[in-house]
Swiss-Prot record:
The keyword Transferase applies. Homodimer. This is Orotate phosphoribosyltransferase. The gene is pyrE. The keyword Magnesium applies.
């Protein structure tokens, strides 16, 4: 596992972004883990978070002209990612985000930031049903820009109603690569080597066997 991935998992555990137990999902499934991106709520969190997103983007090799953050959670993530890309990788990208309600005074419009054009990387926390992604892609295409890819913190690697995960469905629908800082598979591999987390490892591994779409046998 790459260093930044392990460090991100440690960061999530330390800030209790990632917790273990029994959590009922909207689908009715009982998940052994819970990811709460809303707890990235301190200045120090955002600085670290931006670095992890930036590392994942650079590692992916995806090229883009602009970062787009869907309101609301995608906004701070996109801004801190843009800052980290410049500070740590000397990559100075424009960013942009949408408003939930279109403003009809001042600068007006439904977007804030740079002009939405060129190759756009969509940045968000996670993909569940894919509704926010669909709305964002519609905005991107409405401005004659192209979707370069999608960057999220966590790929749950979990089947929906069919055989594909939410991310695989998005990739198939929009013919664009979805990259993540970590995956469920990464978390399982990390926990496997943590003697104090044997119970969590066992629960995640069992859940992955039942609902997962992992790329290889764990």
């Amino acid at each position: 596992m790459k260093k930044y991935k392990a460090q991100f998992i440690e960061f999530m555990l330390d800030r209790k972004i990632l917790t273990f137990g029994e959590f009922i999902l909207k689908s009715g499934r009982v998940s052994p883990y819970f990811f709460n991106a809303g707890l990235f709520n301190k200045g120090s969190d955002l600085i670290k978070l931006g670095r992890f997103y930036a590392d994942a983007l650079i590692d992916s090799g995806i090229e883009c002209d602009l970062l787009f953050g869907p309101a609301y959670k995608g906004i701070p993530i996109t801004i801190t990612t843009a800052m980290a890309l410049y500070a740590n990788h000397h990559l100075d990208l424009t960013y942009c985000f949408n408003r939930k309600e279109i403003k009809d005074h001042g600068e007006g419009g439904g977007l804030v930031g740079g002009a939405l054009q060129g190759k756009v990387l969509l940045v968000d926390d996670v993909i569940t049903a894919g509704t926010a992604i669909r709305e964002s892609v519609e905005i991107i295409h409405a401005h004659s820009a192209s979707l370069a890819g999608i960057l999220v913190a966590l790929d749950r690697q979990e089947r929906g109603n069919g055989t594909l995960s939410a991310i695989e469905e998005i990739e198939q629908k929009y013919q664009s690569k979805v990259i993540s800082i970590v995956t469920l598979e990464d978390m399982i591999h990390f926990l496997k080597n943590e003697k104090t987390m044997i119970e969590a490892f066992s629960a995640l591994n069992k859940y992955a066997e039942q609902y997962g779409v992992l790329r290889k046998n764990l």
